[in-house]
Structure formats: structure tokens, C-alpha cells
Amino acid sequence: MELVRRAATGAIRFYQRFVSPLTPPTCRYVPTCSEYTRQAIERFGVAAGIWLGTKRLCRCHPLHPGGYDPVPERRSVR
């Protein structure tokens, strides 16, 4: 499973380093959605981390105020 975790975080790092700089900053949150997902994968594993990241991306739109939204310390059922 460590290999899958490293592959997932590596893909996010690739995006952060090479793709994201080519686009204007649009994330409404701190940390950014990609960094949030990377941290969630590191903390909770690939499946739960991607789930948390997906939920975060669904909230990242112009009608949401955004702001500081760190990865939770513990995984919740929601």
C-alpha cells in the first residue's frame, strides 16, 4: 500500500510543480485543494484521502466563502 500512497502523492506533487503554475490561482482555501488532498492521503491513506479531497473540491466554488480549512486530525464517518 505504501507504493500506492507514494504514487498518489507523487501525482499530486507533479501537478503542483508543473501544471498548477500554468493556471491562474483559483482555490478558495488554505491549504490549496491539491495540498489538502496530499496531506489527507499522507494522514489517512489513499482511499480516505482521495474521498476527503473530492469532498473539498466539491466545496471549492465561487459561491462558497473558502478560508482556512485544514485536514482534520481524525477521520470522521461523514
Curated annotation (Swiss-Prot):
Keywords from UniProt, A to Z, are: Cell inner membrane, Cell membrane, Membrane
Membrane topology per the record? Peripheral membrane protein
Q: Which GO terms describe its cellular component?
A: plasma membrane
Q: Does the keyword Cell inner membrane apply?
A: yes
Presence of the UniProt keyword Lipid metabolism in the record = no
The family database entries (SMART domains) matched by this protein are listed as: Haemolytic (SM01234)
Q: Where in the cell is it found?
A: Cell inner membrane
Q: Which InterPro entries match?
A: Membr_insert_effic_factor_YidD
Query: What protein family is recorded?
Result: Belongs to the UPF0161 family.
Name the job this protein performs. Could be involved in insertion of integral membrane proteins into the membrane.
Please identify the protein, giving its name as recorded.
Putative membrane protein insertion efficiency factor
Protein species of origin: Gloeobacter violaceus (strain ATCC 29082 / PCC 7421)
